[in-house]
């Protein structure tokens, strides 16, 4: 079955270009030009990924992202202008998985989309643990004391990457390559913001983490200390 991408952008020419590129790569696409309507479209179309512009009529992309994240783990990639530095951070904190700066090359966009859609349906049985958090990898399930912790697919991938090598300290660049699929230097804020989001969900006390630890000046590792 072809995967469906929802393009949320009020720039008709850009939306048309994205549709042509994505359909050429084998994806189904739908286009919405209004933020409020995008929320309805996600519920009705159940897309596999959302390409979300920050500046939208009706409701801006940051608010759309925040509302979607309240009850959906659908991957979200923001489309943003180079001047939107503050908004990029706000978007990531609101739940976006990645972002791409305009103007961008079609190949770069497709690579980001494919990286967020990667899933292996034939994963072997694998159980991991960090501190008191248990991870059932093929079931994409995280629990503490039998209670399930709801993570987005990207947050789950980040936790698994750390848990698989509990003694390794990961630099932000390494995590960008392993979790986001980047093959070139990129913005390490992606990692920092997602670690904060992950800690807010898996730590008993995010200010004193025992699951995802910071190694000052280097990066992150799995806990406990």
Swiss-Prot record:
UniProt keywords, alphabetically: DNA-binding, Phosphoprotein, Transcription, Transcription regulation, Two-component regulatory system
Recorded GO MF terms: phosphorelay response regulator activity; transcription cis-regulatory region binding
Species name: Mycolicibacterium paratuberculosis (strain ATCC BAA-968 / K-10)
Protein name according to UniProt: DNA-binding response regulator MtrA
InterPro entries: CheY-like_superfamily, MtrA_REC, MtrAB_MtrA, OmpR/PhoB-type_DNA-bd, Sig_transdc_resp-reg_receiver, WalR-like, WH-like_DNA-bd_sf
Described purpose of this protein according to its UniProt entry: Member of the two-component regulatory system MtrA/MtrB.
Residue ranges occupied by any Response regulatory domain in the UniProt entry: 4-117
Post-translational modification: Phosphorylated by MtrB.
Any one biological process term the GO annotation gives: positive regulation of DNA-templated transcription
PANTHER family (UniProt xref): DNA-BINDING DUAL MASTER TRANSCRIPTIONAL REGULATOR RPAA (PTHR48111:SF21), REGULATOR OF RPOS (PTHR48111)
Domain of life according to the entry: Bacteria
Entry's Gene Ontology cellular component terms: cytosol; protein-DNA complex
Family matches, as Pfam families: Response_reg, Trans_reg_C
4-aspartylphosphate PTM sites in chain numbering: 53
DNA-binding region: 125-224
CDD domains from the UniProt entry: REC_OmpR_MtrA-like (cd17626), trans_reg_C (cd00383)
């Amino acid at each position: 079955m072809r995967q469906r991408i929802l393009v949320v952008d009020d720039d008709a020419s850009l939306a048309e270009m994205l549709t042509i590129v994505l359909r050429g790569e084998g994806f189904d696409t739908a286009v919405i030009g209004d933020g409020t309507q995008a929320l309805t479209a996600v519920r009705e179309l159940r897309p596999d990924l959302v390409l979300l512009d920050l500046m939208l009529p009706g409701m801006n992309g940051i608010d759309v992202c925040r509302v979607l994240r309240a009850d959906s783990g659908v991957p979200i990639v923001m489309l943003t202008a180079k001047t939107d530095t503050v908004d990029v951070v706000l978007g990531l904190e609101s739940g976006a998985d990645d972002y791409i700066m305009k103007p961008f090359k079609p190949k770069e966009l497709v690579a980001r989309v494919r990286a967020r859609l990667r899933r292996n349906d034939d994963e072997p049985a694998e159980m991991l643990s960090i501190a008191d958090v248990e991870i059932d990898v093929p079931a994409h399930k995280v629990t503490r004391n039998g209670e399930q912790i709801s993570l987005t697919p990207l947050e789950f991938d980040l936790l698994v990457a750390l848990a698989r090598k509990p003694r390794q300290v990961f630099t932000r660049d390494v995590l960008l390559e392993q979790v986001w699929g980047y093959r070139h230097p990129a913005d390490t804020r992606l990692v920092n913001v997602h670690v904060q989001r992950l800690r807010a969900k898996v730590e008993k006390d995010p200010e004193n983490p025992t699951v995802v630890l910071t190694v000052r000046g280097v990066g992150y590792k799995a806990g406990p200390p």
